[in-house]
Design a protein with these regions (language model features):
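Polysaccharide-binding surfaces and accessory modules of carbohydrate-active proteins
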Residues: 1-91, 107-109
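A residue-level signal for beta-strand positions that form part of recognition/binding surfaces
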Residues: 72, 118, 158
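Active-site beta-loop-alpha junctions enriched in small/polar residues
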Residues: 80, 126, 164-166
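Short, structured beta-strand/loop micro-motifs enriched in basic residues and often containing a Trp
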Residues: 95-105
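Short alpha-helical segments and helix-capping/turn motifs at coil-helix boundaries
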Residues: 104-108, 177-178
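Short Pro-Gly-centered flexible turn/kink motifs
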Residues: 111-130
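Short, Lys/Arg- and Gly-enriched loop/turn segments at beta-strand edges
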Residues: 127-139
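An acidic-aromatic substrate-binding cleft motif
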Residues: 137-184
Length: 184
């Protein structure tokens, strides 16, 4: 009853969203419910940032669409460091979602807390809407615009030329740049 959208990402193939049914990811719980067990499995599906490139394989965000209720959940991790997104099966045929910063299992990171100390993981933004992907993305876009801090660049935007994104692959020369700057 739930579709999960996974945002694959790589060097020259950014933001490649793939749609999976939760059952395809083995998040459908147990086949027999209520017979000498609690009726859900311990399976999980997760993806995370890797190394120093936080968007190396995936974007730090996700979408879950409930086909029965018509609700769509969209979320993002608000950190350029390590992060983890985890879906799993829960009681009653439900799914759970965990969004966090670095973890010991995936990133080799942990923090020991002394009595009375606390730790806050990375922030996340989320929205729930009736409807599909377009209303969900629109809601997250409104959120991003609302939380973005004002800065002088809002009034005077400079031109930034990224030669990696414009086919020079880190080997710019004045001549190469002149040939493509006006086209960019």
């Amino acid at each position: 009853k739930t579709d999960i959208y996974v945002p694959f990402n790589s060097w020259c193939c950014e933001a490649q969203w793939q749609k999976y049914d939760a059952e395809t990811l083995n998040l459908n719980g147990m086949v027999v419910d209520g017979f000498n067990h609690q009726g859900y499995g311990l399976n999980r599906y997760c993806y995370s940032g890797k190394g120093t490139w936080s968007t190396c394989e995936y974007l730090p965000m996700g979408i879950a669409e409930d086909r029965e209720t018509g609700e769509t959940y969209i979320f993002q991790v608000e950190s350029s460091g390590q992060w983890l997104i985890e879906y799993g099966s829960a009681q009653g045929g439900n799914l759970y979602l965990t969004v966090s910063g670095a973890t010991e299992q995936e990133h080799g990171w942990y923090k020991n807390l002394k009595p009375g100390e606390c730790f806050t993981t990375v922030p996340a933004g989320a929205a729930v809407v009736k409807g599909g992907l377009n209303p969900a993305v629109a809601a997250l876009t409104r959120y991003r615009r609302k939380v973005r801090r004002a800065n002088p660049d809002d009034e005077k935007l400079n031109v930034v030329f990224n030669d990696y994104m414009n086919c020079l692959m880190g080997d710019p020369t004045e001549q190469k740049e002149k040939e493509i700057i006006d086209k960019a």
